[in-house]
Amino acid sequence: MSKKLFLSLFTLVIVNFIFAENKIISVDAKANISLLNGSISEYVFDPDSHNTDDVLSRLDWDVKNVPIVSVSVDLTLFKYAYFNLGAGFGFPSTPSGNMQDYDWLNCSDFGFPEQYGTELTNYSIHDNFLNSYRNFFVKFGFNCYLPLNITVTPFVAYNYEYLGFDSFDGYTAYKVDNWQKDEELSGNVISYFQETNAFLVGIKLISPVLFNFKIDGEFFISPYATNINSLDKHYMRQIHFIDLMPRSYQLQSNLNLSYSIHKHHKVFVQGFLQYIPVSKGNDYIRETDENGNYTSTNWTIIKSVQGGTSRFLWQISLGYCFSI
């Protein structure tokens, strides 16, 4: 009985703090749905390549109108301490444009004439589908209150992201055949997965505008504090590749416009940008059998080449916020 009484009193105290005029705790609970767009590129760099920047191969994975559902909670403690926790999830098997594979096999190892120079030698295109997407975010900051009801919040953040794509069917074409369709492909050709762990610093600005509208923006930077691991599965070649790209650089930004229907209810539209310039790292290889089972014990580093990636993604969201 005493435990129940204590829990009841504790709950009443917390509720009183939340709903009091001078709040100790303020909560914004948000839910939104968005469409994710952009592209992610995968690279192979070979110092023997005659192509620009030593690019031997590039795979462009479309991110096209991929629906994402996200939830987040903003907590403000004692008016100044700021905490944010959020997560987002995608829907597997969602169509996502194409995957296009470009090769510049103009170095002596592949036997192509040197006069090809920077010209493309091989090309293929495939239907692209989302395999998986999940995103987790946590932020800690400190609110600074300025005149005109403007709030500035510097913060530190951690972001975990995992996404993957499957490419199916399509065809290949080659320069030596004057780019005629050479081979029709069927089934799963290549799958690609990226796992990203990032530590970021940023700043958030909130400002009221006309009527019941409010605008807030965030800018993040990860100064070579993003770790990217990628896995590339070539099913037809029965080969898997891993690229390890520590100390990568990235930028993110959000812009949010909200409208207060009631003091506890808001609707909002939000835009998001993410940019990761070309990042490079060690490339590892491992062979498989026709069923995808590994035929070798360990991953072997390919000392003659490097793997790499880059991305530019943007997102438009519509959402609802409940404030207490």
Question: In which residue ranges do the predicted regions lie?
Answer:
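Short helix-capping and hinge/turn segments at secondary-structure transitions, especially at repeat
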Residues: K204-L210, K214, Y224-T226
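Extracellular/periplasm-exposed beta-strand and loop segments of Gram-negative cell-envelope proteins
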Residues: G38-V66, F91-N135, E161-T196, S222-N254, ...
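Post-signal peptide N-terminal segment of secreted/secretory-pathway proteins
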Residues: S70-N84, G88-S93, G97, D101
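Acidic, polar low-complexity intrinsically disordered regions
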Residues: F89-S93, F137, G141-F142, T151-T153
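Short, structured protein-protein interaction patches enriched in aromatics and acidic/basic residues
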Residues: N32-S34
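Cleavable N-terminal export/targeting peptides
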Residues: M1-S26, S323-I324
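Outer-envelope beta-barrel architecture signal
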Residues: E21-A29, P67, K79-L85, L148-P154, ...
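Residues on the lipid-exposed face of transmembrane beta-strands in outer-membrane beta-barrel proteins
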Residues: V71-L75, F136-C144, V156-Y160, V201-S207, ...
